[in-house]
């Protein structure tokens, strides 16, 4: 029997507990001062439900606008539009006419493989087995917009793929696995639909050499390591030794900068380290902000600390009935805006990728500095001395 709920060593946390095994032990029994804000996760759960319904029943997602998901969230146009990108992408890649449910097509495929590890269980959004090509396709829908999910070497994707191969007993039938991530609301340089391939041999090596030993270690280890994986760690609100060490080092770097006359006087090594530390420090700062905000909401005074509680900015919205009134006042043509879908949204349409391959392009943009483990391709710049020749007198 497959356990209910999320595994404490599930796929969504694999990237974190493999990097920081101590986060699992530190999280046990920890009750954060601030409750997780489900205003971000709840619409994603509803979008998953919309996509699941559309894939199972073959209908269009827009028909669900105005209904309520099981978690009580009202399904609106934004949720439907995002879910439809996922549905279109799946159908475009795998012709529904070829689907045999439970044979080569699986929606919300659950797995639990205690022979690998008691806590090895989860649910894959959509799975397609291409037997002639000896290829398994594992699809994962991401509703979030704030954190872009990279598909290359994605720990959650590999976790789910391993679980599905084991659950369906396909290790001997499949040579290659394609992991698909669809993130319609996040702006990614590769678009909202991304994929990455891995051989079953490589995946099996990762499963037995990295994942399972990592799961065992996470159950007993107190070893912590700070990184961008801290964004989703429950202990980011607690006394995490790794985050505390980062904050101490930031303080030391600020002292060095002061002695040198400013952060712009730091050496390349010092500046690079400072930027890396601050990227992680912002995670702790965000957790502190959320805790402070929760206290202020309950009436605790924060004025003495040079802060105050204010109303959040909101854009104006129309009251009920405004749509009909606007059409009557301005006419339908002037009241509504019609424009071409973005290349990212066109990608999700049938034959969309073929169209954008011909018609879409990336204009030249600026540059920015990111952490080294970011999957974007690095840009090389020559030193000025290597570009310009000395003027001959």
Regions found by a protein language model. Give the residues of each.
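Extended, charge-rich alpha-helical segments
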Residues: 283-393
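Short, glycine/acidic-rich hinge or "gate" loops at secondary-structure transitions
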Residues: 62-65, 170-178, 295-299
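Hydrophobic/aromatic-lined pockets within catalytic cores
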Residues: 55-59, 143-146, 161-169, 216, ...
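Mg2+/Mn2+-dependent nuclease catalytic core
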Residues: 99-217
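Short amphipathic alpha-helical coiled-coil/interface segments
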Residues: 79, 83, 87, 271-292
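Short, charged, low-complexity amphipathic alpha-helix
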Residues: 178, 208-280, 377-393
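Active-site-proximal structural scaffolding
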Residues: 119, 153, 226, 271-277, ...
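Metal-dependent nuclease catalytic cores that hydrolyze phosphodiester bonds in DNA/RNA
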Residues: 1-138, 178, 189-192, 278
């Amino acid at each position: 029997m497959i356990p209910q709920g999320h595994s404490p060593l599930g796929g969504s946390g694999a990237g974190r507990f493999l990097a920081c095994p101590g986060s699992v032990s530190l999280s046990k029994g920890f009750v954060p001062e601030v409750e997780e804000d489900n205003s971000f996760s709840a619409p994603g759960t509803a979008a998953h439900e919309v996509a699941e319904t559309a894939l199972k029943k073959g209908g269009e997602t827009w028909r669900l606008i105005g209904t309520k998901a099981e978690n009580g969230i009202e399904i609106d146009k934004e949720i439907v539009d995002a879910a439809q990108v996922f549905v279109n992408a799946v159908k475009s890649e795998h012709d529904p006419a070829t689907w045999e449910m439970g044979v080569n097509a699986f929606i919300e495929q659950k797995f639990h493989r205690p022979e690998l590890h008691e806590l090895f269980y989860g649910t894959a959004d959509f799975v397609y087995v291409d037997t002639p090509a000896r290829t398994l396709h594992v699809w994962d829908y991401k509703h979030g917009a704030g954190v872009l999910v990279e598909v290359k070497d994605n720990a959650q994707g590999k976790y789910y793929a391993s679980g599905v191969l084991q659950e369906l007993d396909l290790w001997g039938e499949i040579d290659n696995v394609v992991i698909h991530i669809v993130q319609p609301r996040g702006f990614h340089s590769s678009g909202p639909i991304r994929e990455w391939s891995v051989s079953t041999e490589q995946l099996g090596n990762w499963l037995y050499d990295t994942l399972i030993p990592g799961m065992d270690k996470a159950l007993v280890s107190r070893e912590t390591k700070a990184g961008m994986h801290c964004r989703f760690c429950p202990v980011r609100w607690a006394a995490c030794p790794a985050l505390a060490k980062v904050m101490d080092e930031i303080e030391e770097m600020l002292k060095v900068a002061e002695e040198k006359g400013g952060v712009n006087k730091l050496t390349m090594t010092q500046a690079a380290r400072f930027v890396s530390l601050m990227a992680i420090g912002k995670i702790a700062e965000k957790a502190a902000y959320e805790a402070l905000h929760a206290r202020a909401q309950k009436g605790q005074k924060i004025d003495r600390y040079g802060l105050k509680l204010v109303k959040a900015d909101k854009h104006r919205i129309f009251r009920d009935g405004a749509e009909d009134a606007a059409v009557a006042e301005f006419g339908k043509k002037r009241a509504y805006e019609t424009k071409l879908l973005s290349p990212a949204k066109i990608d999700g349409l049938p034959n969309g990728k073929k169209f954008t391959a011909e018609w879409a392009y990336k204009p030249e943009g600026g540059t920015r500095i990111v952490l080294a483990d970011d999957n974007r391709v690095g840009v090389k710049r020559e030193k000025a001395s290597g570009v310009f020749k000395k003027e001959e007198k």
